[in-house]
Amino acid sequence: MFKDYKRMFRFDTETNSLNPEPCGEILELGGILLTKPEGSDKFSERQDISVLIKNKYPLLNSDIHHITAEMCQGNGVTKEELFELLKGIFGDYSDTLIVAYNSPFDMKFVRAFMEEMSPGYKITNPVLDMLEVARDRTGLYRGNKLCDMIVRYDVKDVENSHRALDDCNALLGVMRAMWKEKPDIENYIRK
């Protein structure tokens, strides 16, 4: 699976709004970075990433993701630290596949953030949106939330909690189940 890629970054964001403009920000970024060791065709090295970000705007939607201002201020990384982390993942790696559930939402926040930190910065990695796969599999436009896919594919031992790393683990389970159902997921990659 995914033979053209040396790394795969499955990620999710929790945000304080639905749009990055005028003052929407990433509150939390979670991800699972999978790497193929040299000479291998299987992803076997895993790095879990979970960071809260120190923000200047008020937190909204705390009732959904349960992230508080105190959590971000006390345990959060600076925007500069997040930028360096993401640059190391997205960087100049055309062999790193980016995977998300509803990737247009997450990517618009990440792109806006990277552009804010470094004007002109472009993310050029190939992207796989698993929501697009889910819509094709169900034949429905609505009713394809990640929690719906967890139930549909009977994925065990995962939680869709609206916390970024939990949702990445759920995505990993759903993605494996979808691959077993029909191994055509690579056809959905947008370069």
Predicted regions and their residues:
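Conserved beta-strand -> loop -> alpha-helix junction used to position metal-binding or nucleic-acid-contacting
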Residues: 121-135
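A structural signal for well-ordered alpha-helical segments within the folded catalytic domains
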Residues: 144, 169-172
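Acidic two-metal-ion nuclease catalytic site recognized across multiple nuclease folds
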Residues: 1-3, 152, 172-191
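Hydrophobic side chains within alpha-helical segments
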Residues: 109, 132, 169-170
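Conserved non-catalytic scaffold segment of RNase H-like nuclease domains
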Residues: 2-124, 139-162
